[in-house]
Amino acid sequence: MATGSTELLIGWCIFGVLLLAILAFCWVYVRKYQSHQESEVISTITAISSLAIALITSALLPVDIFLVSFMKNHNGTFKDWAESNTTRLQIENTVLIGYYTLYSIILFCVFLWIPFVYFYYEEKDDTDGSQCSQIANAFKYTSGFILVCSCLLLIGAFAPLDIHTNKNSTDLDKIKLLFLELGSSNGLAALSFSISSLTLIGMLAAITYTAYGMSALPLNLIKGTRNAHYERLENSEDIEEVEQQVERIMSKCKDGRPLSSKDRQALYKLKEKLRTLKRRDRHLEYHENNCWTKCCIVIRPFKIIWGILFILVALLFIVSLFLSNLDKALHSAGIDSGFIIFGTNLTNPLNMLLPVLQTVFPLDYIFITIITMYFIFTSMAGIRNMGIWFFWIRLYKIRRRRTRPQALLFLCMILLLIVLHTSYMIYSLAPQYVMYGSQKYLWENNSTQETAIGNSSASVLKDCDASAPEDQCTVTRTYLFLHKFWFFSSIYYFGNWAFIVVFVIGLIVSCCKGKKSVIEGEVEDDDSDLSDDEEHPYA
């Protein structure tokens, strides 16, 4: 057992290193986008902490998979220190406690801390009242989120878990036995239901932003941006044209006659357009003379290579997701069981790759980290291109060094929910890996064969799957926690199809769109001239 404990400690040590790397990444990421003029300590700490907690939770997934895989030898037998079911349960409970803690913190962030900080700054902007009144109003609005959280916990604690279906009773027994491993605690069910509800919202965010970002980001890297010099020449022509239109309207009142309401309205619009064009000219002049713009020309081939790599990775994900969903559609136990699969019938590339990588520790750790970071960057690309919307109303724009505290909190909330959904996405891409890792078991063949001694049964080494004997394979806590309620799994299944459709639509749209402006997102009609100081000084 001492040897096993030492080796298991390696997995947790790497988790600790990842934790530090995650904190550093979140700090750099948030500081990159926050407005330096409107920077607030509380909003910055809240954004960094909430995003870090989500990423740390996702980092538990490879630890969980490593632990269940490490308990078994390559020949399908349990290692000496893991032969006791009690020992295996204790090891897995350490992961479960980790999930308990981190998911509880996520609920606290989503339903209390982030809403409170958001409404506090909204009150700070809208009113000139005292700080006490701002805090009181923020708590008043936050109480609605606390009520929603309480309802989710109550529903989760008492929601029926029985699977009603006319499928084969043997399959039903296997499904029920899987989830009995996690226990029947009402507290655990309540937490699982609440987190699954948030993961459902994360699925909608992933369909909206990540699916589009997976196609937009690589194609933007491949196509590049327009030339700053030629773009500035076009902008100068537009400025001259608008100035001529303004002069024509102003010439009507040279003799002292007042302008008509129609002319006044047209003059106002032209002056606003002229103001925006002049701001664009200042930004284009800066980019035209900027050293970084010249460096981008040199590294352009590398951007094209990265773009090609990203689009290949995106296609790999989509193909794997399609094959996994198709496998569920053809061979699963049905919608009433959450489309659980008994064995892998249609093998996808990622489901084959991850168990192989796990044999050389920590390659699977690195690969899972790359997948999570890929989802983060593509989600960010989608959010930057689209902005944060509520139905048809755009709430906030996300721009480097110019994002307001409220928008930053919204951004980190969306990314937190998307990262929560990442665990299920990885399961969809590699179901066998997420459920059992690289575990194998010995299957006793019922047929007998004659030997010199007599008749004997043959043992076959098989990969663990949902049809394996209960005492031969250990299911990860991640899978059981996120799939305790079968109806969420069914919704996730249809969400995966929606994800594929949105990706294809986004790919077509991105291919049809031309090159982006070199100052894309830097200048908007509703920006003030003072906002230029966020980007760079024009002295």
From Swiss-Prot:
Topological domain spans for side Cytoplasmic: 29-47, 120-142, 208-303, 384-406, 506-539
Pfam families: LMBR1
Gene Ontology biological process terms in this record: insulin receptor internalization; protein localization to lysosome
Transmembrane segments: 8-28, 48-68, 99-119, 143-163, 187-207, 304-324, 363-383, 407-427, 485-505
Extracellular-side segments: 1-7, 69-98, 164-186, 325-362, 428-484
GO CC terms: clathrin-coated endocytic vesicle; endoplasmic reticulum membrane; lysosomal membrane; plasma membrane
Coiled-coil segments: none
Glycosylation, residue list: N75, N85, N168, N345, N445, N446, N455
Function: Lysosomal membrane chaperone required to export cobalamin (vitamin B12) from the lysosome to the cytosol, allowing its conversion to cofactors. Targets ABCD4 transporter from the endoplasmic reticulum to the lysosome. Then forms a complex with lysosomal ABCD4 and cytoplasmic MMACHC to transport cobalamin across the lysosomal membrane. May play a role in mediating and regulating the internalization of the insulin receptor.
Protein name: Lysosomal cobalamin transport escort protein LMBD1
